């Protein structure tokens, strides 16, 4: 059972409060602490600022903040309500005040409360300012919640997008700067990419240096607009052969520098594949008539080398940036794809002639 001790501040309780202020120990304590009569309003702990109601307000006491409602036992509640009915009061607070006034002589004999216990109680001005400050904060929070809830409309959505876009220019600018810096670095390094030809070729185990490595590769460069040419990277050689490869034709492509094609003027997309200064041929002997006049004997020496049989443990596929010193950077001649096809056609006819003779 609960009995509301302070249901209302008006009504019949005014006289009771006046009596407490003049005589009872509680009134004297209040006067000693606050220095004025009727300062009970300063001891109200209002909860309206936090969303509560006035009837849920609490009070400051010597032992801290306490609730205004008092829980009674069953027997005490029955006696209290019987007394309230006998007094003819419609509010429990009036019956409580009557009881306090009737017990005033006994209350006066009780020891007074320690004024130091009320040192933490704020003054009237501070108590009035705190709810006002809390109320303003609550109003601001409600306005922000309303604005957030009303953002479902198209206008609010547009404003939210504008705020988001306005807060992102710094990030966008930094990302754009990074892109520009990356493109500039790629353009500056285009020549270096062109200088190293991308190739995969055939290696001859057992021979060291450039003489034992017949690393002849195909290099292609593709250029899109003003972007630097994209190609493979010079790779160490890998070797392969198969059992019974004595009569197999040995194909090779000579390694050479990859010349970066000039970027097109209009920013148009241009797919440009260029072959290195090697030629495609079959190792059926030295064909001087089909070989370019500017090919050196060094390349012919490599074309004469035989591939060894494959050992399963020696297969290596290596792709990466090879040192430029391993393969000479000097270009000994350029040959177009048409010339390579013609050279291959000559080898094919030569092979057919040898078969017909046999």
Curated annotation (Swiss-Prot):
Residues 1-29, 127-163, 282-308 are annotated as: Disordered. Residues 143-156, 285-296 have a biased composition (Polar residues). Residues 52-110 form the TCP domain. InterPro entries: TF_TCP_subgr, Transcription_factor_TCP. This is Transcription factor PCF6. Forms homodimers and heterodimers. GO terms for biological process: regulation of secondary shoot formation. The keyword Nucleus applies. The keyword Chloroplast does not apply. It comes from the Eukaryota. Residues 7-16 have a biased composition (Gly residues). PANTHER family: TRANSCRIPTION FACTOR PCF6 (PTHR31072:SF114), TRANSCRIPTION FACTOR TCP4-RELATED (PTHR31072). Transcription activator. Binds the promoter core sequence 5'-GGNCC-3'. It is found in: Nucleus. Keywords: Activator, Developmental protein, DNA-binding, Nucleus, Transcription, Transcription regulation. The gene is PCF6.
């Amino acid at each position: 059972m609960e009995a509301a001790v302070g249901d209302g501040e008006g009504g019949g309780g005014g006289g009771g409060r006046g009596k407490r202020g003049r005589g009872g120990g509680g009134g004297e304590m209040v006067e000693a602490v606050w220095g004025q009569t009727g300062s009970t309003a300063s001891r109200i702990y209002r909860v309206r600022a936090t969303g509560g109601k006035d009837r849920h307000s609490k009070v400051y006491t010597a032992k801290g903040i306490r609730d205004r409602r008092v829980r009674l036992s069953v027997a005490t509640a029955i006696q209290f309500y019987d007394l309230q009915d006998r007094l003819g009061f419609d509010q429990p607070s009036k019956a409580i005040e009557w009881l306090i006034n009737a017990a005033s002589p006994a209350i006066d004999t009780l020891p007074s409360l320690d004024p130091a216990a009320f040192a933490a109680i704020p003054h009237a001005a501070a108590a009035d300012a705190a709810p006002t400050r809390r109320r303003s904060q609550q109003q601001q929070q409600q306005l922000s919640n309303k604005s957030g809830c009303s953002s479902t409309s198209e206008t609010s959505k547009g404003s939210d997008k504008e705020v988001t876009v306005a807060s992102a220019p710094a990030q966008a600018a930094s990302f754009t700067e990074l892109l520009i810096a990356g493109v500039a670095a790629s353009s500056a390094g285009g020549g270096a990419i062109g200088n190293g030809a991308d190739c995969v070729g055939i290696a001859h185990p057992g021979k060291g240096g450039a003489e034992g490595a017949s690393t002849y590769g195909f290099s292609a460069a593709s250029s899109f607009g003003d972007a630097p040419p994209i190609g493979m990277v010079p790779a160490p050689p890998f070797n392969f052969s198969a059992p019974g490869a004595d009569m197999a034709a040995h194909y090779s492509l000579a390694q050479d520098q990859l010349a970066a094609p000039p970027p097109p003027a209009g920013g148009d997309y241009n797919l440009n594949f260029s072959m290195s200064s090697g030629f495609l041929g079959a190792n059926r002997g030295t064909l001087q008539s089909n070989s370019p006049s500017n090919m050196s004997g060094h390349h012919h020496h490599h074309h004469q080398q035989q591939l060894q049989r494959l050992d399963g443990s020696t297969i290596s596929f290596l792709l990466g940036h090879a040192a430029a010193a391993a393969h000479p950077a000097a270009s000994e001649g350029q040959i177009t794809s048409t010339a390579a096809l013609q050279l291959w056609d000559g080898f094919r006819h030569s092979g057919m002639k040898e078969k017909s003779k046999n």
